[in-house]
């Protein structure tokens, strides 16, 4: 038993080291993540605007940091801004800066994020939460590479590479008139879709290993083994909170562990398993796109229900819809 644990953990460590050496904190060897990392490499050396799309907790900031670190701007620190973290008035001042006396309480000049990010990259997280009234100013600085501080008419030139991220459906927001179409097209130059953790189960053992050792080191614990059954249990879970949720679960496990073997303790209600074996298997030479299209046709375009495509594929309805969206499959065109 002990020798098997050692062998399994040595294999995980070797895979982990190979990944970490190329992309720092990004962990993943699945096909889904390999596709993401290829896109990161392709776009990093340009100055093109990047839009990172993905659910909460998928690691969008890590992707932004990787793009910056691989770019020619990596000699300067990447500047970060969360558009959902403050009200519109403060957000405008934080982005563009202000002059003394520009508004009540502006007792001194302030340099904004666009100015701080000159010759570097600016990461705008949760860009879908930017108020409509601020969006024209963001569009202008992207188009003209110039702006004014609040309370000033002086144009300031800036050389900034923008990386934006959101967990919201910007296309739908444009339709609903909650997001400007011209800004959307300006941001959507090079979109990168970050898959949720449930679509990359092969990466879970690597992530568990990385989080366990990182957290154990931080807490001064010595944990050098992770049982195979623990990895299987974690791999079967759905993870609605994605990588962030997994990291929190591992932190709890490290806290509760006594000894050098990770002890996983989960309340029963937390264990929501993903389907283990699909009811319909791919035919020889059939890829994921072809499999889903075939099953949708056989199901007459029905996704949910006992005879729906999701049930036949052994997937949750939301998971199948997410994959259909990623692969560009429209069920209405198949019936």
How would you label these PLM feature ranges?
Residues 248, 280-335:
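Bacterial C-terminal helix-turn-helix
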Residues 25, 38-105, 115-131, 196-201, ...:
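Conserved post-Walker A coupling segment in P-loop NTPases
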Residues 1-53, 269:
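Flexible nucleotide-interacting loop at or near the entrance of a catalytic core
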Residues 12, 36, 58, 81, ...:
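Conserved RecA-like P-loop NTPase ATPase core
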Residues 3, 71-76, 135, 151-161, ...:
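Nucleotide-binding/hydrolysis machinery
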Residues 22-23, 29-33, 135, 201, ...:
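The cytosolic transmitter module of two-component sensor histidine kinases
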């Amino acid at each position: 038993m002990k020798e098997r644990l050692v062998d399994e953990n040595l294999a995980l460590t070797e895979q982990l080291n190979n990944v970490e050496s190329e992309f720092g904190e990004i962990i993943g060897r699945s096909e889904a993540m390999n596709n993401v990392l290829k896109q990161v490499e392709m776009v990093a050396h340009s100055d093109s605007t990047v839009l990172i799309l993905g659910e909460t907790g998928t690691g969008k900031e890590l992707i932004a940091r990787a793009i910056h670190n691989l770019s020619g701007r990596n000699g300067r620190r990447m500047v970060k801004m969360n558009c959902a973290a403050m009200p519109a008035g403060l957000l405008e001042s934080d982005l563009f800066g202000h002059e003394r006396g520009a508004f009540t309480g502006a007792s001194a000049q302030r340099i904004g994020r666009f100015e701080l990010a000159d010759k570097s990259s600016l990461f705008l997280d949760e860009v879908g939460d930017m108020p409509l009234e601020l969006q024209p100013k963001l569009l202008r600085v992207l188009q003209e590479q110039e702006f004014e501080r609040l309370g000033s008419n002086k144009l300031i030139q800036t050389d900034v590479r923008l990386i934006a991220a959101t967990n919201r459906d910007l296309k739908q927001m444009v339709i609903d008139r909650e997001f400007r179409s011209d800004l959307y097209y300006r941001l959507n130059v090079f979109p990168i879709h970050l898959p949720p953790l449930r679509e990359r189960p092969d990466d879970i053992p690597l992530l568990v290993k990385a989080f366990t050792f990182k957290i154990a080191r931080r807490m001064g614990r010595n944990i050098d083994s992770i049982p195979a059954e623990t990895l299987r249990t974690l791999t079967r879970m759905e993870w609605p909170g994605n990588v962030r949720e997994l990291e929190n679960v591992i932190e709890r496990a490290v806290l509760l562990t006594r000894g050098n073997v990770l002890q996983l303790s989960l309340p029963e209600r937390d264990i929501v398993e993903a389907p283990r074996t699909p009811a319909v298997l791919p035919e020889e030479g059939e890829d994921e796109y072809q499999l889903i299209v075939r099953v949708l046709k056989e199901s007459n375009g029905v996704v949910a229900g006992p005879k729906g495509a999701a049930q036949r594929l052994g997937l949750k309805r939301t998971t199948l819809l997410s994959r259909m969206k990623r692969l560009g499959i429209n069920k209405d065109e198949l019936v």
